[in-house]
Amino acid sequence: MSDALIASSSEAPQSPAEQYDPTRKQKSADKTARIPIKIVPAEKLKKPDWIRVKAATGNSRFYEIKDILRANNLVTVCEEASCPNIGECFGKGTATFMIMGDKCTRRCPFCDVGHGRPDPLDVNEPGNLARTIAQLKLNYVVITSVDRDDLRDGGAQHYVDCISQTRELSPATRIEVLVPDFRGRLDKALDILQACPPDVMNHNMETVPRLYKQARPGADYAHSLKLLQEFKRRNPNVPTKSGLMVGLGETDEEILEVMRDMRAHDIDMLTIGQYLAPSNHHLPVLRYVHPDTFKMFEEEAYKMGFTHAAVGAMVRSSYHADQQAHQAGFA
């Protein structure tokens, strides 16, 4: 028997991480097992009294919304990212639509959206989305997506198709987009978006620059700022927006410094919310920020010149986005 055969026969069975199937959607431990940064477990903190999730009421539209989404083959980030506010939002007949599939090309360890090799774009999705929005009679919608690093334009044209077809069927509906970073294809993506810009342009900074390597592998802090500033330069009448999580190990001063950077890059609207780990296989919560600190962030935001700041433990980027835009005078 050859040495090669001896080595082969004595190998241990492959672990799940080694049996990697790029076409399968990976979540939780399967997703985070392959990122270059090891997740270091921390003592699980007890949730404080101010962390409260509103459940859907008995007479809500929760199941109606779910049925309509499934009938139209649509995905929401509310479901895919395990958002704690899903009961309240679906119950009120609102949802944040997630386009371009349910498999992201990134593996951010704070996020519960699945990772894998994305499927080809669904050419029928913009039409399905537009008809669903019209059926639900929505006055304000948020459209987001997975990262699509496999596409030459990062998915920008698909965004434009969704925006334009929605406006055809629902001309009075305001459209906010929460876009990926289009890293490596920024100019091309912005050129495409300029043909049919949204009513609000949102891209989340997510965390402070010191934690980017750990929390946002594949992303770049300066690039994300540039995306929003360059979009604003090209579309000065369209408000820009960004969001941050707290509880990943940042300091209050680091959050304030990011807010200053946002204003220096012409970002108009701000959201800040408490990070809640989707599972034990995601980045751990290292602190629960007190409501008094959230209030301080909000006060400082208005001093810095943000037109609107939604700041609080359960705030998410698209949570009550219609109210945020209205209070800022944009909707």
From Swiss-Prot:
SUPFAM superfamilies reported in the protein's UniProt record: Radical SAM enzymes
Compositional bias annotation for Basic and acidic residues: 21-33
InterPro entries referenced in this protein's UniProt entry, alphabetically: Aldolase_TIM, Elp3/MiaA/NifB-like_rSAM, LIAS_N, Lipoyl_synth, rSAM
Record pathway: Protein modification; protein lipoylation via endogenous pathway; protein N(6)-(lipoyl)lysine from octanoyl-[acyl-carrier-protein]: step 2/2
PROSITE patterns (alphabetical): RADICAL_SAM
Cofactor note: Binds 2 [4Fe-4S] clusters per subunit. One cluster is coordinated with 3 cysteines and an exchangeable S-adenosyl-L-methionine.
Lineage, uppermost ranks: Bacteria, Pseudomonadati, Pseudomonadota, Betaproteobacteria, Burkholderiales
Family matches, as NCBIfam families: lipA, PRK05481.1, PRK12928.1
Binding site residues for [4Fe-4S] cluster 2: C104, C108, C111
Compartment list: Cytoplasm
Enzyme Commission designation: 2.8.1.8
Binding site for [4Fe-4S] cluster 1: C78, C83, C89, S318
Top EC category: transferase
Protein name as it appears in the record: Lipoyl synthase
Bias (Low complexity) ranges: 7-19
Principal location class: cytoplasm
Family: Belongs to the radical SAM superfamily. Lipoyl synthase family.
Cellular compartments per GO CC: cytoplasm
One function term, GO molecular function aspect: 4 iron, 4 sulfur cluster binding
Keywords (A to Z) from UniProt: 4Fe-4S, Cytoplasm, Iron, Iron-sulfur, Metal-binding, S-adenosyl-L-methionine, Transferase
Named cofactor requirement(s): [4Fe-4S] cluster
Disordered: annotated span: 1-33
Species, as recorded: Cupriavidus pinatubonensis (strain JMP 134 / LMG 1197) (Cupriavidus necator (strain JMP 134))
Catalytic activity: [[Fe-S] cluster scaffold protein carrying a second [4Fe-4S](2+) cluster] + N(6)-octanoyl-L-lysyl-[protein] + 2 oxidized [2Fe-2S]-[ferredoxin] + 2 S-adenosyl-L-methionine + 4 H(+) = [[Fe-S] cluster scaffold protein] + N(6)-[(R)-dihydrolipoyl]-L-lysyl-[protein] + 4 Fe(3+) + 2 hydrogen sulfide + 2 5'-deoxyadenosine + 2 L-methionine + 2 reduced [2Fe-2S]-[ferredoxin]
Ranges of residues in domain Radical SAM core: 89-307
PANTHER family: LIPOYL SYNTHASE, LIPOYL SYNTHASE, MITOCHONDRIAL
